Amino acid sequence: VMAGGIVAAFLGPGIATWTWDLFTSAPYAGSYVSLLILYIVSMMLIFFAKIPRPSPEEKSGPARPLSQVASQPEFLVAVVSALVAYGTMNLIMVATPLQMKGCGFDLVSSASVVKWHIVAMFLPSFVTGHLIRSFGVIRIMACGPVLMVFCVLINLNGITIVHFTCALVLLGVGWNFLFVGGTTLLTEAYRPAEKAKAQGLNDFLIFSTAAMTAVSSGFLHDRFGWTAINWAVLPAIGIALCAIVWLGRRRRVMLSSRVA
């Protein structure tokens, strides 16, 4: 799966640049047709996927109500972190090619920036798990919002190809630390029999946010501009960072009380 993200980082932008003018009467129609073909192929491959069956413990083990699971601090911080990770990433990533086009850059330049952004999203996954085991999930998660703040600062201070590339690389790594860390933290909030419900709610919230921010980013860029989008994500990033720091302190206090 992780290697697939790296392949997609090069294949996706490449397809966009190769096919955008496939139909001269409708620019970018070729890219959408190519995307449709890829979706059809993906759907066909899914039919052959072997999904593991739930274990006996997942089927009939002790389970709490979903409301009780979702009210735990670990669950709340994990979900908030993932929502901010996807929401911030989508708003800035989708708006970046639009801003670059407005600054006079061509499609090849925009595709290159998006390519390195996607590489930065998935390449760290090969070491993120090791970093979490070595430094703890809270520390790695806290790095995500910090990197995203640096991404915003770069975006607000220049519109060169270097600015766009560096900002989106930081955004990609920040997304990885925040999302992978949040996913890891989520596993601490549920029992095996609660897994399906807890992850189902988590995924519903995350991908609803991802869909809304992806759809609205273009409109927001057109209506309010590039600078406004970057300023707008800062409060959400701050909320995620505060939530992570709060949970880290809460855990230390609880650990100290147990030792005492």
Stretches found by the model and what they are:
Residues W20, P124-V137, H221:
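Helix-to-loop junctions at the C-terminal end of transmembrane segments
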Residues V1-G14, L205-T213:
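Glycine-rich segments within core transmembrane alpha-helices of 12-TM secondary carriers
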Residues F177-Y190:
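Intracellular juxtamembrane helix-capping segments at the cytosolic ends
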Residues R139-I154, L234:
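Structural signature of the two symmetry-related core transmembrane helices
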Residues A189, A193-F224:
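A late C-terminal transmembrane helix in Major Facilitator Superfamily
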Residues T17-I37, F219-I237:
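A membrane-interface helix-boundary motif in multi-pass transporters
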Residues I51-V79:
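Juxtamembrane intracellular "pre-TM" segments in multi-pass secondary transporters
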Residues T17, L36-P56, A243-G248:
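C-terminal membrane-cytosol helix-exit motif in multi-pass small-molecule transporters
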